[in-house]
Curated annotation (Swiss-Prot):
It is an enzyme of class 2 (transferase). Mg(2+) 1 binds at H131. The gene is prs. This is Ribose-phosphate pyrophosphokinase. Homohexamer.
């Protein structure tokens, strides 16, 4: 069996080290930096010939820099005769640009990135909670899309929730919320229906379901600026919700996210470590992080040993 080796770019160094620790190994020796003009510089400083290589790199902000690091590392390893290269992308950037809405003149950038990764020699992709699962079909190589929900669910069960109800922040997240509700002792579910009555009128949030006197668990795949999430929490509290917890896999936290969360009525925001948090976000008392290192380490081990990934999520 080929030697398994882990390498990491600069996007998620702490997560990469945690994964390596879980696998009782060390990260491979690679110098990933910049030339004086800002171009990505990569040098692999150990033998990888015939190896089973895993590159751990989220394509989070700065998205283009991290994506280029990943593809240049793949090229360097391919030219060094690596046997198989798996791109471990905990957070897959550009995933929200996955279709042309109403035939608008816009790119399908998720497909562009998929083609880019395939063209440089990626043999397989391992990612977490793709924004749209059909993005797997954009790739010409196998894609394992694993789920953060078991880690989030395990934490939810420790909260001592009082008469809980799972809330989807929009119509598109109903399938995710329903799955969590079923696993959370088959609890009830509510949906927030956001709509604008007419142009230039503020968005109105209609809550489908009874949340009065209950602990609400908002679930989503990602939190970006947090603006919509915070407004959803306000709407739930106005409808009599007792406490509001927000769970998401990917903590993008861009723009005014820190201020939004600091001033929100959300009791706690729980996210995973697919994207590093800024110091400002880390300082917020209502934000907590869970690690996916154990799950990703197990997925990497299974891929390397040609074992089933789906078996990890069978209940």
């Amino acid at each position: 069996m080929p030697d398994m080796k882990l390498f990491a770019g600069n996007a998620t160094p702490e997560l990469a080290q945690r994964i390596a620790n879980r696998l009782y190994t060390s990260l491979g020796d690679a110098a990933v930096g910049r030339f004086s003009d800002g171009e990505v510089s990569v040098q692999i400083n150990e033998n990888v010939r015939g190896g089973d290589i895993f590159i751990i790199q989220s394509t989070c902000a700065p998205t283009n820099d991290n994506l280029m690091e990943l593809v240049v590392m793949v090229d360097a390893l391919r030219r060094a005769s690596a046997g198989r290269i798996t791109a471990v992308i905990p957070y897959f950037g550009y995933a929200r640009q996955d279709r042309r809405v109403r035939s608008a003149r816009v790119p399908i950038t998720a497909k562009v990135v998929a083609d880019f990764l395939s063209s440089v020699g990626v043999d397989r992709v391992l990612t977490v909670d793709l924004h749209a699962e059909q993005i797997q079909g954009f790739f010409d190589v196998p894609v394992d899309n694993v789920f953060g929900s078991p880690i989030l669910l395990e934490d939810m069960l420790q909260l001592n929730l009082d008469n809980p109800i799972v809330v989807s922040p929009d119509i598109g997240g109903v399938v995710r919320a329903r799955a969590i509700a079923k696993l959370l002792n088959d609890t009830d579910m509510a949906i927030i229906d956001k709509r604008r009555p007419r142009a230039n009128v503020s968005q109105v949030m209609h809550i489908i379901g009874d949340v009065a006197g209950r602990d609400c668990v908002l679930v989503d795949d990602m939190i970006d600026t947090g603006g919509t999430l915070c407004k959803a929490a306000e709407a739930l509290k106005e409808r009599g919700a007792k406490r509001v917890f927000a769970y998401a896999t990917h903590p993008i936290f861009s723009g005014n996210a820190a201020n939004n969360l600091r001033n929100s009525v959300i009791d706690e925001v729980v996210v995973c470590d697919t994207i590093p948090l800024t110091d400002e976000i880390k300082a917020l008392p209502n934000v907590r992080t869970l690690t996916l290192s154990g799950m990703l380490a197990e997925a990497i081990r299974r891929i390397s040993n040609e074992e089933s990934i789906s078996a990890m999520f069978e209940h």
